[in-house]
Swiss-Prot record:
Example of a GO cellular component annotation carried by this entry: cytoplasm
Classification via HAMAP family: TmcAL (MF_01539)
The name this protein goes by in its record: tRNA(Met) cytidine acetate ligase
Sections of the chain in a coiled coil: none
Species in which this protein is naturally found: Thermotoga maritima (strain ATCC 43589 / DSM 3109 / JCM 10099 / NBRC 100826 / MSB8)
């Protein structure tokens, strides 16, 4: 989840998920301060975790930045690995436009098994110049047609939640997880819908309302507690944070780098390093820079992710290793009194070390006897800290911009009111 911000659709998903699987506890794995579309969250991860707890989540875990800022495949892989590593998660419920779990499982199985015919179709579609998501869609349509299945079904994968759902199931197959997957029909506006649609407006639309300071419409789109905490963060100068706030810095940073620098960064290929190098010098705003880099084959989300990888100097080897070995720790962002119970069980059953107090993460690493890659553990957690330090520099209030928030803020603990 991203909860950027936590809106009525998220509350519907959470409530429906509880009704569907009747869990003893509810755990959410959430992006930190940067999200999968390559953008900053409008308020920071601690405030968003607090909202999730107030809305009924028992434990909020952080998805490490190296996964939270990847494409759908990397994002889903990190999330499923974290949930599986808790040792206590049995079911995952995700929102879906199609609400067709059998179709999503069929596609995930194709992606996992990689039949020769599918690989051939994918290669041919990529050669036509399509972006990877579109090339994969067309390759799947051809594969479905070859099998005598309804190829029009593949058009469901044009929707963001269904794409992510396929990747969740695919990731579980890759790691041999026994987690059961369920879908909840997405309600309200589509994710990319930029218009206000009342109670069930999309997160994209809500962020646009925030840009325009249309607070009454924002209030209508969020649960009461979510709106209350959002406004608290804004009034105290810790939000909202938008990508455009970072634009001048990002463009300046890119102008200082040569193509050799970009070639070492994860995700740069097909001439993108040259496009970054040239466009940074030919444009005067970050918006114009994105338009300059954009081509038929590259999505804006991909370009924004590459921009973040560049600033954080995320190299290819680090991401490849992370995508092979997965997250190396479980970071706790917050929990309720009820959540304490499941945390106690997690400490006995978890497959990865649990980091609750960030000031002690090195001791956690030294003491663990779990099979983790210690160097990768340090690299992943270092990126999380780096991302938080960078993010806080763009708080509206100068007084709030102090660094090391990962160490000064402890996990949110929500007590049950008497």
């Amino acid at each position: 989840m991203e909860y950027n911000p936590f809106h009525n659709g998220h509350l519907y998903h959470l409530t429906s998920a509880r009704e569907l699987v009747k869990p003893d506890y509810t755990i959410a794995v959430m992006s930190g301060n940067f999200c999968q579309r390559g953008e900053p969250a409008v308020i920071d991860k601690f405030a968003r975790a607090e909202i999730a707890l107030r809305m009924g989540v028992d434990v909020v875990l952080e998805l490490p930045v190296v996964f939270a800022t990847q494409d759908a495949g990397g994002f889903a892989f990190g999330a499923v690995c974290v949930l599986d590593a808790t040792g206590v998660v049995t079911d995952v419920v995700f929102g879906s436009e199609s609400n067709d779990i059998e179709f999503l499982q069929r596609v995930a199985r194709i992606l996992y098994e990689q039949p020769d015919e599918y690989q051939k179709f994918l290669h041919e579609e990529l050669k036509k110049g399509y972006s990877f998501p579109n090339a994969r869609k067309y390759a799947l349509m051809r594969y479905f047609s070859m099998k005598g299945w309804n190829e029009e079904e593949v058009l469901k994968l044009e929707k963001s939640n269904d794409i992510l759902g396929v990747e969740y199931i695919h990731s579980a197959l890759k790691i041999g997880s026994n987690i059961r997957f369920h879908t909840i029909k997405r309600v309200g506006a589509e994710e990319k819908d930029t218009s206000f649609r009342g109670r069930f407006s999309s997160a994209t639309a809500i962020r646009n309302l925030m840009r325009e300071k249309r607070w009454e419409e924002v209030r209508d789109s969020l649960p009461e507690d979510s709106f209350e905490i959002l406004m608290r963060e804004i009034n105290e100068g810790r939000g909202p944070v938008f990508l455009e706030n970072m634009g001048d810095f990002l463009l300046s940073f890119f102008r200082l780098k040569n193509m050799d620098f970009f070639e070492k960064i994860h995700g740069f290929s097909e001439g993108l390093e040259k496009r970054f190098h040239v466009c940074a010098r030919q444009t005067g705003s970050y918006r114009d820079f994105l338009e300059c880099v954009k081509a038929k084959r590259f999505t804006f989300s991909r370009i924004r992710r590459l921009a973040l990888f560049s600033v954080f100097e995320v190299n290819k080897e680090f991401v490849e290793k992370s995508n092979t070995k997965g997250p190396q720790y479980i970071r706790i962002l917050g929990f309720t009194e009820k959540g304490r119970e499941i945390l106690s069980l997690m400490r006995k059953k978890a497959k990865l070390p649990i980091v609750t107090n960030m000031s002690l993460y090195r001791k956690v690493l030294e003491k663990t006897d779990l099979p983790v890659d210690k160097q990768l553990f340090l690299e992943q957690i270092d990126l999380d800290v780096k991302a938080t330090n960078f993010y806080s520099m763009f708080f509206p209030s100068v007084e709030q911009r102090c660094g090391e928030r990962d160490f000064s803020i402890h996990p949110i603990f929500l007590r049950t009111e008497m």
